[in-house]
Amino acid sequence: HFMSDTKWLLQHGFKEIEKLPNGFSLLVMSFHENSAVPYFNDCVKSGECPDKLGIVAYYSNRCPYTDYYVNGVLRVLAQERNIPLKVIKLETREQAQNSPTPATIFSLFYNGKFVTTDLSICTESKFTKLLK
C-alpha cells in the first residue's frame, strides 16, 4: 500500500488547496501563475458512496493484486458473513472521475461510508476488525 508522504511534499513546495473530511488532501505545485487550479470533483466530497447497505469496493487495474483480492478474497469473506458486496471496477477515465473516491486503485465503503484505500482490508483479520 503506497500513499505519498504529505509532510515531505509540503516541505518541497507543494500547497494543500483542498482537504476532504475523510483525510484526502489535494496538493499542488504550480509552475505558472495562470495555471488552472485543480479541485476535487463534487462526487468525492461527502466521503460516502450511493450504496448504503453492506460493502462496496471500487477498484481499477492500476495494481496487479487488486483484482485477486477484491474478486477472490473479499467476495469469500463477505459471503461467509452474509454481507452484501458490490464490486465496481473502474475501467474508464470517466468512471474514475465520477466515482465517490479520489483513490481509484482501491477504495472500500461500508454501509455507505468510506473506510480505507488499504487493500490489506481484504485479509481475514483486518476484515473482521472492520466489522466490529
Protein language model annotation of sequence segments:
Residues 19, 28-32, 79-81, 98-99:
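Non-catalytic substrate-recognition and accessory regions of acyl/acetyltransferase enzymes
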Residues 100-109:
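Structural micro-motif
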Residues 110-132:
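Non-catalytic, surface beta->alpha helical segment in thiol-disulfide oxidoreductase systems
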